[in-house]
């Protein structure tokens, strides 16, 4: 079968939180912006799709009261003045997405899902199942704010089981993957460690595929240098041993054959179509 290429894709900035740079790469005590990127792509038959959503005003509403307020204090967020993901897409000439792929359920990745009342949500089932069973305080500690999910979320959910994922070939033989559309245009990749059900994505684009590893690292320089994360950053990973194992697998891929991108990496932020916002 001939593989399908995605003719159009773009990163966008969906707001940011401000944190110590040291937490991401162990360098310096200054603060930097950790942009909440989302990614749009156009599939020839499925139309516009989205990966994550960034922040929106719904994040502020969800963190107005306690214990959710603690999350806002720990990760002080600033919304994009250009609007939420739905408004940003419209401004840049994109149709509303039919499907939104959720890499995981941390608030900076699902903060705008309520802005898309007709979209379907695709995710790894364990990513939500594990968090939904926790008390609210524990959910907040895990970075999950249940009020960010719209009413009727389950009616529009496409919850994928791990049994649908299989070992890839060649460079991907260490990864469990799913050819989502069945045409090799988009591969979902299980990248355990950072959060329950954490996913990355391989997009078949020119001039070479993009491997969007979402939060498998926060800075590609840290990934390449193999510098350990500071202790506080290790403790907030869902499983730090799995996180390290995932990074090792990513480093073993031939870097000349793809373009790596990570959600909060300064390099990836410069690729955003609305970088100047």
Predicted regions and their residues:
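Active-site metal-binding motif and surrounding structural segment of the metallo-beta-lactamase
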Residues: 64-123
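C-terminal/domain-terminus segments
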Residues: 4, 26-33, 123, 133-154, ...
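Zn-dependent metallo-beta-lactamase
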Residues: 1-76, 249, 255
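Core dinuclear metal-dependent hydrolase active-site scaffold
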Residues: 11, 37-43, 49, 162-206
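Hydrophobic "anchor" residues on beta-strands that sit immediately upstream
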Residues: 48, 120, 209-211
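Cap/insert and terminal regions of metallo-dependent hydrolase folds
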Residues: 72-87, 206-277
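Metallo-beta-lactamase
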Residues: 77-96, 126-189, 235-257
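Active-site metal-binding loops of divalent metal-dependent hydrolases
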Residues: 53-55, 105, 194-195, 215-216, ...
């Amino acid at each position: 079968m001939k593989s399908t290429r995605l003719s159009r894709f773009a990163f966008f900035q969906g707001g940011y939180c401000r944190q110590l740079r040291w937490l991401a790469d162990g360098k310096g005590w200054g603060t930097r912006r950790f942009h909440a990127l989302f990614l749009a792509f156009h599939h020839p038959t499925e139309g516009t799709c989205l990966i994550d959503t960034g922040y929106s005003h719904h994040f502020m509403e969800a963190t107005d009261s306690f214990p959710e307020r603690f999350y806002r204090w720990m990760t002080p967020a600033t919304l994009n003045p250009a609007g939420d993901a739905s408004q940003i897409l419209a401004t840049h000439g994109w149709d509303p997405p039919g499907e939104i792929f959720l890499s995981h359920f941390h608030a900076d990745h699902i903060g705008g899902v309520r802005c898309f009342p007709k979209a379907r949500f695709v995710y790894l089932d364990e990513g939500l199942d594990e968090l939904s069973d926790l008390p609210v305080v524990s959910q907040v500690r895990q970075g999950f704010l249940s009020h960010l999910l719209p009413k009727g979320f389950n009616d529009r959910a496409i919850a994928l089981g791990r049994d649908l994922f299989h070992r890839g070939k060649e460079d991907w033989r260490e990864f469990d993957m799913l050819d989502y559309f069945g045409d090799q245009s988009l591969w979902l990749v299980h990248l355990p460690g950072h959060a329950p059900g954490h996913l990355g994505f391989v997009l078949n684009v020119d001039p070479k595929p993009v491997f969007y590893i979402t939060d498998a690292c926060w800075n590609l320089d840290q990934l390449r240098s193999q510098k350990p994360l500071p202790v506080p950053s290790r403790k907030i990973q869902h499983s730090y041993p799995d996180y390290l194992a995932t990074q090792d697998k990513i480093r073993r891929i031939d870097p000349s054959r793809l373009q790596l991108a990570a959600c909060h990496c300064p390099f990836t932020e410069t690729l955003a179509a609305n970088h100047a916002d």
